A protein has these predicted regions:
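Acidic/histidine-rich, metal-coordinating catalytic segments
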Residues: 102-117, 135
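Two-metal-ion RNase H-like nuclease active-site motif
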Residues: 48-58
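Short loop/turn microsegments at loop-to-beta-strand junctions
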Residues: 64-65
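Short, surface-exposed connector motifs at secondary-structure boundaries
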Residues: 73-77, 99-105, 153-154
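Active-site beta-loop-alpha junctions of metal-dependent nucleic acid enzymes
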Residues: 57-61, 78-101
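Basic, flexible linker segments flanking DNA-binding modules
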Residues: 1-43
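Charged alpha-helix within mobile-element recombinases
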Residues: 98, 119-199
């Protein structure tokens, strides 16, 4: 009211104004657990096994890339899928993380419908899943940043039917062998293995 003065009183539709409240911050995904409930240890990056997930879309109708990044080591996983249907994305995530199942504690998603099968993912991997607030990409900033690096290999608008699994593997390998300043210029893949063996 302070910003709009008394003008809101003259609005039609029953004198109602839009207010961004709790309902606008709630995930549309069924049984979604909010990022607000995520353990503090995930933010601190003290342990191995907390992941962020996303999808990168190709040119319309040509498929998607499922991406996962581990928060402590920055290990980055990519898989090409035919579509971003929830069942397809569910299967991809389970396949990607099963080799690292001992290092999967949590997975944080955005509110895309492709992650609607999160309960099945939890069951398969023995992990807890959390959802960022809508329109809050910074809450998964690591994944967003890693996807930006992936775009150097697979630019936005690429027809993913023309991208081979080998292309994806090479991009993933480059990202995991790229020294990171935040890791003391060490490589994500080596950092991941160091912590994995020490556990």
């Amino acid at each position: 009211k302070a910003r709009g003065g008394q003008l809101y009183r003259h609005l039609r539709q029953g004198h109602k104004r839009y207010r961004k409240g709790a309902s606008s911050l709630r995930s549309p995904i069924k049984e979604a657990r909010s990022i607000d409930e995520r353990p503090a240890i995930v933010d601190s990056r003290e342990r191995l096994g907390d992941w962020e997930a996303d999808t990168v879309l190709g040119k319309q109708g040509t498929g998607a890339l499922v991406t996962l990044v581990e928060r402590k080591s920055r290990l980055y996983l990519v898989k090409r899928v035919a579509s971003k249907q929830a069942g397809v994305v569910r299967d991809a995530i389970i396949e990607m993380l099963t080799p690292y199942i001992e290092q999967v504690h949590t997975i944080t998603f955005d509110n895309g419908g492709e992650f609607a099968e999160h309960k099945a993912i939890e069951e398969a991997l023995g992990a807890e899943t959390y959802f960022a607030h809508p329109y809050s990409s910074w809450e998964r900033g690591l994944n967003e940043n890693s996807n930006g690096l992936l775009r150097q290999f697979i630019p936005k608008g690429t027809d993913l039917r023309e991208v081979t699994d080998e292309d994806v593997r090479r991009a993933e390998q480059w990202l995991n062998l790229r020294p990171r300043k935040c890791l003391g210029f060490r490589q994500p893949v080596k950092v991941f293995e160091e912590y994995r063996q020490a556990a």
